Amino acid sequence: MTIRFDNVSYTYQKGTPYQHQAIHDVNTEFEQGKYYAIVGQTGSGKSTLIQNINALLKPTTGTVTVDDITITHKTKDKYIRPVRKRIGMVFQFPESQLFEDTVEREMIFGPKNFKMNLDEAKNYAHRLLMDLGFSRDVMSQSPFQMSGGQMRKIAIVSILAMNPDIIVVDEPTAGLDPQSKRQVMRLLKSLQTDENKAIILISHDMNEVARYADEVIVMKEGSIVSQTSPKELFKDKEKLADWHIALPEIVQLQYDFEQKHQTKLKDIALTEEAFVSLYKEWQHEK
């Protein structure tokens, strides 16, 4: 499954005194099996971009093509339904949208709406919940008797229960404790590597971006100003400063180390493990 943006612009309240162009002339492509991160300041157009992915918003100008379906501002919703079935959208604080009295009913709400096999959906959701640390009897419990972090994980899995090919998540770990953050991020990564799903992550946490993403899309004032690998992105401190993007902690540590020892390691470390490996190599060659 491939999603392609061709010269996509979106204007809110078009034709009124309050009209605002949130994204303009966006050209990019999302491929199944890859992990994308979308970063940029608040108001840079990230949320508008992802809402055009499955036509929650339709382009004011330009086209979004999902496999053989082309979406424009004129496309009727009945032609978009197959797209929405294959693209799972998890917005910020999804726990606020929980409403069923048991976890099981919450899990089958989406699949039932799309006339999917409910037993398969329940089994798939149960496996994902177990991966997130829930007990085996979780399906019979009420989500409203759980902690905020547990409710967040329940809400995320309720979207994943539809087994979408492309998963779009907007700040999924905001406000979670460190263990829950790791569980959610590792689950998303495993869905990419083990099930060939595309992950599209909006995040302000550059540590997550560095560790998990294959490609990073940087947005500024409604435009894509960069689309590259994390290693290439975090090499250019001047551009990062201009885009108001912080360095990941491990990359900052590497730069501090290099400055202190007046040296240059052979590569950019995106994880603690990679930094340790580069450090050992540097020690060996001293």
UniProtKB/Swiss-Prot annotation:
Mitochondrion is among the record's keywords: no
Residues in the signal sequence: none
Keywords on record: ATP-binding, Cell membrane, Membrane, Nucleotide-binding, Translocase, Transport
Please give the name of this protein: Energy-coupling factor transporter ATP-binding protein EcfA2
Q: Which PROSITE patterns match?
A: ABC_TRANSPORTER_1, ABC_TRANSPORTER_2, CBIO
Q: Which residues cross the membrane?
A: none
Task: Cite the record's note on assembly.
Answer: Forms a stable energy-coupling factor (ECF) transporter complex composed of 2 membrane-embedded substrate-binding proteins (S component), 2 ATP-binding proteins (A component) and 2 transmembrane proteins (T component).
Family stated for the protein in its record: Belongs to the ABC transporter superfamily. Energy-coupling factor EcfA family.
Q: Which domain of life is it from?
A: Bacteria
Q: Which GO terms describe its molecular function?
A: ATP binding; ATP hydrolysis activity; ATPase-coupled transmembrane transporter activity
Native source organism of the sequence: Staphylococcus aureus (strain bovine RF122 / ET3-1)
From the UniProt record, report the name of the gene that encodes this protein.
ecfA2
Q: Which residues bind ATP?
A: G40, Q41, T42, G43, S44, G45, K46, S47
Described function = ATP-binding (A) component of a common energy-coupling factor (ECF) ABC-transporter complex. Unlike classic ABC transporters this ECF transporter provides the energy necessary to transport a number of different substrates.
Membrane topology annotation:
Peripheral membrane protein
A GO cellular component term found in this entry reads:
ATP-binding cassette (ABC) transporter complex
PANTHER family, A to Z: ENERGY-COUPLING FACTOR TRANSPORTER ATP-BINDING PROTEIN ECFA2, HEAVY METAL TRANSPORTER
Q: Which residues form the ABC transporter domain?
A: 3-246
Instruction: Cite the Pfam families for this sequence.
Output: ABC_tran (PF00005)
Read off the SUPFAM superfamilies from this record. P-loop containing nucleoside triphosphate hydrolases
- InterPro entries the UniProt entry points to: AAA+_ATPase, ABC_transporter-like_ATP-bd, ABC_transporter-like_CS, ABC_transpr_CbiO/EcfA_su, ECF_ABC_transporter_ATP-bd, EcfA2, P-loop_NTPase
